[in-house]
Regions:
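Transmembrane helix-loop junctions at the membrane interface of multipass transporters and ion channels
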Residues: 83, 113, 117-121, 170-191
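Structural signal for the N-terminal portions of transmembrane helices
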Residues: 91-92, 157, 161, 181-193
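Alpha-helical transmembrane segments and their membrane-interface boundaries
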Residues: 2-141, 150-152
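Alpha-helical membrane segments and immediately flanking helix-loop junctions
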Residues: 139-143, 157-167
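Hydrophobic alpha-helical membrane segments of integral membrane proteins
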Residues: 59-66, 154-160, 173-174, 186-187
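Small-residue-rich segments of transmembrane alpha-helices in multi-pass membrane proteins
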Residues: 97-107, 162-174
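Alpha-helical transmembrane bundle and helix-membrane interface signal
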Residues: 23, 148-156, 176-183
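Small-residue-enriched core segments of transmembrane alpha-helices in multipass membrane transport
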Residues: 65-70, 133, 161-169, 192-193
Length: 193
């Protein structure tokens, strides 16, 4: 029994390849920046997601999820909570609110000028969240925590970005505003939150 316990502890040891606190902090800081590359990628991800939703293209929407920098600010909020840094949590939360507002505003403009106004199945899928969406967010967040704290870069963070699908609900909320549909707007924001 002791041998089995030792083997299990060895197999599930998360400290073996853990990055230093400085490395973790630096990664999270760089992912939470709201300027330069991160802002350019945010804009591009929003347009890619909006076009994918408009054209009903799952592959394009997944591409937008992969490049979206929204995960960085959310990780920063979690890091601030974990380190009891309320000022950092507040600063990161304000950054997230800015990103949310910016994405909704720009996607609203996109959908307002888009010649395609019919709701695709991809748009509809983001208006009725279920308990499964909550579980995906919970387990995705846990995987993200483990992934960002490793010494070596892994494919965990892109996988979490796809699983949690942050950008498409914001763009769907923009669609709801552009088409004056409270159902799309409220359902998509509920899914995002």
């Amino acid at each position: 029994m002791d041998y089995l316990k030792k083997v299990l502890l060895d197999v599930f040891d998360l400290n073996a390849d853990r990055a230093s606190m400085e490395e973790i902090s630096e990664r999270i800081e760089s992912g939470a920046l709201l300027k330069g590359t991160n802002m350019a990628i945010l804009i591009l991800a929003m347009f890619i997601a909006s076009i994918g939703l408009n054209m009903n293209s799952t592959a394009v929407i997944i591409g937008a999820m992969l490049i979206s920098p929204l995960m960085g600010v959310i990780m920063a909020i979690g890091y601030g909570i974990a380190t009891y840094d309320t000022a950092y949590v507040r600063k990161s939360f304000l950054k997230l609110l800015f990103q949310i507002g910016f994405c909704i505003l720009t996607s609203t403009i996109y959908f307002y000028i888009s010649p395609i106004s019919t709701a695709s199945s991809e748009l509809l899928a983001r208006t009725e969240p279920t308990i499964w969406d909550v579980l995906i967010a919970l387990f995705g967040g846990l995987a993200g925590i483990i992934g960002i704290t490793r010494k070596e870069k892994s494919n965990v963070i892109p996988g979490v970005a796809i699983a949690t699908a942050l950008m498409p609900p914001l763009c769907t909320a923009g669609y709801g505003i552009a088409t004056h549909s409270l159902k799309f707007f409220s359902g998509a924001l509920y899914l995002f939150c």
